[in-house]
Amino acid sequence: MVPANRRDFLRSSAVLATCAAACAAGDATAQAAAGSAPPASPLRVNHDLHTHTLYSDGAHPIPLHITEARAFELDAIAITDHYTPGSQLAKSEEMFERYLAEIERERSAQQDVRVLKGAEATALDTSGRISLDARHAARLEWVLFDLGGSSEGTLRHPPSDKQQYAENVVRTYLGLCDVEYLNGISHPFNTGNTRPAVLPADYPPALLRELAAKMAARGKVFDVMNDMVYWFHQSPLAPRQLTAQYVELVKLFAAAGVTFQVSSDDHRTGLGNTRWSELVLARAAVPASQIVDPRKIVQR
């Protein structure tokens, strides 16, 4: 994520977001006791495949980042620092080489957690043009793309017409599916803080089904990011409404056979904090067979 105020927002809201998810789970349990639908069964996921370090806008150096993953007894993490216009990894070949070398050195010094060399690039326009080329991607093991401040026609200069905006978002994702070296789409449909805001329920189901079918066919992973509330905190959507709408999105993509990952999108001390992500997957009844298995990701 690229907004400059992200850390400040997270300091004030991370606890609230986690509490909202916990309260929602508590409400579901109470409803079950009253005879309504039973709560979703817990889904055991123990990876975090979208995280950041000091090589972009994260808070911690790589050695500490991996030490935290070991302390939290995660099975796997992906270090996915930003490879976007103006970022240090994109500007400096030397910095990119240093980044890869440091991940390799630190992960090789321990056996507790599987660590993947990754990056989070960004879409540059609605055609699926991207900020990371194939040559650099070939050096990586887990490549994510997002919509961010450089994504023309979506988060950058969004159309004033909400329907056109929603179509632009889906068409951008359809274009990204054609990028062979793309593994996953970061926090899909993160369009709540723009003007106009496009909420999960605003996306046309026919377009979503088209995208879901293509993601499943091309093996592109849907990133269920724990702090999705960040991307909607300026919208009129209440946190639990966001959860309910996002669950419906995930259900649609799961029905098409799309594979999912969970992530914290950690920028500070949230590594492994995927409580909301797992809640969404459980409520959407996503089977374990449609969750990424990091052990099967080839390391280079």
State where each predicted segment sits.
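A structural motif
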Residues: 74, 140, 181-182, 286
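N-terminal secretory signal peptides and thylakoid transit peptides that target proteins
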Residues: 1-17
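Divalent metal-binding pocket/active-site signature
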Residues: 59, 85, 93, 142-234, ...
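Non-catalytic positions within long, well-ordered alpha-helices that form the structural scaffold/packing
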Residues: 70, 136, 177-178, 254
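A metal-dependent hydrolase metal-coordination microenvironment
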Residues: 41-167, 171, 263, 267-271, ...
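Charged catalytic cores and adjacent phosphate/nucleic-acid-binding surfaces used
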Residues: 31, 35-49, 62, 135-140, ...
